[in-house]
Regions:
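Residues that form or immediately flank small-molecule/cofactor binding pockets and catalytic motifs
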Residues: 26-28, 290-292, 488, 544
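Low-complexity, highly charged intrinsically disordered N-terminal segments
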Residues: 45-95, 220-223, 227, 250-253
Length: 563
């Protein structure tokens, strides 16, 4: 008791004196081990000119100090851009399938799925702020006492706002908003058209009412059905039932932000029971957060720490690449990965067909890979088998071994093949390029001269290099984030996915804050550098599979409207 009292008095005196400190928990041995590690790191921090105060903030943010040093080195030296060799196209890195072949692959998956544990992984942590960006800008800049909405649209050349207002009654949230407006403004019916539209937008985004820009996309009304309005959570539950269930069980994993988890759970409580009842399939739902330890420090143009008004360090999330750690924690034979906003109101059967077909491609290739690795382990591979495996690597996995391979001894050839095959596998749907912003499939050369298939974002390309720009512009396909992943090896053990990340494929993100340049580091993207060393198969899939809602006006597209 006296010890606890002494500790709390001592702690308070440190707080009063504004002295940085770290509180350790655990038994004596673990506290001692932690203390030694902290002291070692603190002395390292001091060598690099980092104050005790800053060190404590970094420690409390759970970021290993070596990671901070790595980030500072990256800010100083920059990051090499991707070296594009050519776009991946059908018959040159992208597998093209006929409708019959899609059906055949899907049927193969249906045949095999009962012996597999399936899971759907949906990144869903972001707020919907970007979705309503043009509406927020309108509310910030528009003064209804000084100009008309039409004058604002002309002044700003804001076609998005014009479309939003013209098609307002087509949005699935229109009726609920209209009802609320009539409660708030008793004279709403007789108001001028501009006032009606202005109040509609204001109420939609107001924190006192609908507050849509601060909510996660997952809980927003997306689709108007005859009987009800569905949000993306419900649509993902429906998709689970259609293609991600085996033995009457489906598993769904959302990555969410901590502040939004209650919103998810409240929705899931109602929707899960409804979908389970209609389908007869049990759906297990789990959540995880993006680890704080994957955040980045923020620096200025001199690579010095940037601080807020309270003199605290500023940390930023490390981007969706951080989710490789969440994916690494999952246990399943086949994992479907899809973004929260890529759902459809109609044609769910068609979507299911293509998802199942991708899974069929994965299982077929995986069977062959596992068979070869099993034979290698049992030493059943002979010299005359190598040609067949080399052809498989080339034709099915787009891996060329190069001329040096022929000079290897038999033992080294087998070791090389084992190293190439013993990796997680991803099958990625690719849609026809229609000018959407985002990444695409390319043949890329790394710093060791090795060429492989990668999904590359525009921000990874040197846009000042004419040749690279031409290759980027020649892309025929686009990455819709439509992945099916195999994360277990031939012994049915989970891979450590962190071992297959290309740490050199991150991004430096530059932003202007109060007129000053600030930089932060974004981890290699989940489907970019985080999976750079996976076995990769790209499959062309129809555009019907890609229906993202990036802005609120996307809800006006046919895929999100009643038919």
């Amino acid at each position: 008791m006296v010890e606890k009292l002494f500790f709390s008095v001592f702690k308070q005196s440190l707080i009063d004196a504004k002295k940085p400190f770290i509180t350790l928990s655990g038994d004596k041995e673990s506290r001692l081990a932690k203390a030694i590690a902290i002291i070692d790191n603190l002395s390292l921090a001091k060598q690099h000119g980092v104050s005790s105060d800053d060190f404590v903030q970094i420690y409390n943010h759970e970021i290993p100090f070596e990671k901070i040093l790595q980030q500072l080195k990256i800010f100083k030296n920059g990051i090499l851009k991707s070296n594009l060799i050519s776009p991946a196209k059908i018959k040159n890195g992208i597998l093209g399938l006929s409708e019959d072949e899609f059906k055949e692959k899907a049927a193969f998956f249906d045949l095999k799925k009962e012996s597999l544990k399936l899971k759907k992984f949906v990144p869903a942590s972001g707020a919907a702020s970007r979705m309503f960006k043009f509406l927020s800008a309108f509310l910030n800049d528009f003064d209804i006492t000084r100009e008309t909405i039409n004058a604002y649209i002309n002044r700003k050349k804001d076609s998005d706002l014009s479309i939003f207002i013209v098609a307002m009654d087509k949005f699935p949230f229109f009726e609920a908003l209209d009802k609320k407006l009539r409660e708030i403004y008793l004279d709403f019916e007789v108001l001028d058209r501009d006032y009606k539209n202005y109040y509609f937008i204001k109420t939609l985004l107001s924190s006192d009412y609908f507050d849509f820009a601060n909510k996660p996309k997952a809980v927003l009304p997306f689709h108007q059905y005859k009987t009800h309005i569905a949000n993306p959570i419900e649509e993902h539950l429906n998709e689970c039932v259609h293609y991600a269930s085996s033995n009457e069980v489906s598993n769904l994993h959302f990555t969410v932000s901590e502040v939004h988890q209650n919103l998810f759970e409240n929705e899931v409580e109602v929707l899960k029971e409804k979908v389970e009842k209609e389908s007869g399939i049990e759906i297990n739902i789990a959540y995880s957060y993006q680890n704080k330890s994957t955040d980045s420090i923020t620096v200025n143009d001199q690579n010095e720490f940037v601080r807020d008004k309270n003199n605290n360090l500023i940390f930023r999330p490390g981007g969706h690449g951080a989710l490789i750690e969440n994916l690494n924690e999952l246990d399943a034979d086949v994992i479907f990965v899809k973004n929260i906003d890529n759902v459809i109101q109609n044609h769910i059967g068609k979507i299911a067909l293509y998802k199942k077909a991708l899974a069929g491609v994965l299982i077929k290739v995986q069977q062959k890979v596992f068979d070869y690795l099993d034979k290698i382990e049992k030493q059943e591979i002979k010299e005359n088998n190598l040609e067949e495996i080399v052809a498989f690597l080339s034709k099915k996995l787009n891996i060329e071994l190069g001329n040096d391979f022929n000079k290897f001894t038999f033992e080294n050839k087998v070791n090389k093949i084992k190293d190439l095959l013993d990796r997680p596998i991803r099958v990625c749907g690719m849609v026809k390029n229609e000018g959407e912003p985002g990444g695409g499939p390319f043949w890329v050369m790394n710093d060791k001269g090795s060429i492989s298939l990668q999904i590359v974002e525009t921000s990874q390309v040197d846009l000042t290099n004419k040749k690279q720009l031409e290759i980027l512009a020649a892309a025929t396909h686009f990455n819709p984030v439509d992945l099916v992943c195999g994360i277990k090896n031939y012994k049915n053990e989970k891979f450590d996915l962190l071992k297959f990340v290309d740490p050199k494929a991150g991004f430096i993100v530059e932003k202007s804050v109060d007129g000053k340049l600030v930089k932060s580091y974004e981890l290699p993207g989940l489907w970019n550098g985080a999976m750079a060393n996976w076995l990769t198969i790209f499959v062309a899939v129809p555009l019907i599979t890609f229906n993202p809602v990036k802005t609120v006006n996307d809800l006006l597209k046919p895929a999100h409207q009643p038919q």
